[in-house]
UniProtKB/Swiss-Prot annotation:
Signal peptide feature range: none
InterPro entries to which the protein is assigned, alphabetical: UPF0178 (IPR003791)
Protein name, per record: UPF0178 protein BCA_3127
Family: Belongs to the UPF0178 family.
Length: 146
């Protein structure tokens, strides 16, 4: 198992790196050049920089990921593609994407886009909380223990 992180806006990178390093599982952070960092990472963590274009990180993750790798993303489109490839996919708020829930998530995203396109406003995501982080940590630890 390898872990790939859609890292541009991921608020749980620290949890992923800490827990994966303890478990000796390699982590690849995929992020755009606009989020370049000189921060030192453990040797088991690789950072891949991609262009800032739409979905560039998603495409790179899909090129790298193999069946049974673990991907962390908040992007439903990437999650859908990764599930089809046989990957384990987690959201940073602490839930697992599955073939049972991805269709509903994609449908909700589509309907919200149509509402916005018509000029109306939609609610944004709720703020990320410490409880969300701990929920993610528990799920992540259970997934890498398999």
């Amino acid at each position: 198992m390898k872990i790939y992180v859609d890292a541009d806006a991921c608020p749980v990178k620290d949890v992923i790196i800490f827990e994966a390093t303890k478990a000796k599982i390699p982590v690849t952070l995929v992020t755009s050049f606009s989020h370049y960092s000189n921060a030192e990472q453990p040797k088991s963590v690789e950072t891949i920089y991609v262009d800032s274009g739409a979905d560039a990180a998603d495409y790179r993750i899909m090129q790298l990921a193999q069946k049974e790798d673990l991907i962390v993303t908040q992007d439903y489109g990437l999650a859908s593609l990764a599930l089809a490839k046989g990957c384990i996919v987690l959201h940073h708020k602490g839930y697992k994407y599955t073939n049972d829930n991805i269709e509903q998530l994609l449908q909700t995203r589509y309907l919200s886009a149509m509402v916005r396109k018509s000029g109306k406003r939609t609610k944004g995501p709720k703020p990320f909380t410490a409880e969300d982080k701990e929920k993610f940590r528990a799920l992540f630890k259970s997934m890498i223990a398999l």
